[in-house]
């Protein structure tokens, strides 16, 4: 499995999802990013079993494949590279990874992508498109009030409610309570859910 990708683009996408990674995982495979190639699209994922985040970017590739790559080591390598194409060569037999650039080669030991936890399918899902600035502002205005008590998971996140006439974000740690409402964001289908705090930070 070989592919070529922009080092800066890859670092940007990995930086977006690395917040999900834990410093002490019960499953060693969770210390890795999952790389999944289909056609010319690379999907990178990170998970802590509770939250999984994924991002996609374009690559040059002639074959599909799946590999788990050590997250910390890969981030450090990419931070030391200037923006130019880098080549990943993956041995499917022993999961050895060679990253080549104009400045040298790096060798890593990866893992089978099949070991990475599968993301459960969402039944009866519905989707909604919102302006990213609206979501970002709503999170910034409410997240600081969320608690961090793992024994009370309902309070360690941000409650989001979408209605036909507004969007409401609520967060509390039992001492302070914040409600942020937007009248310029609407949803045809009313729904509510709790965003875990960790991936929002």
Question: What is each stretch, according to the model?
Answer:
Residues 1-201:
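Structural preference for solvent-exposed beta-strand-turn elements
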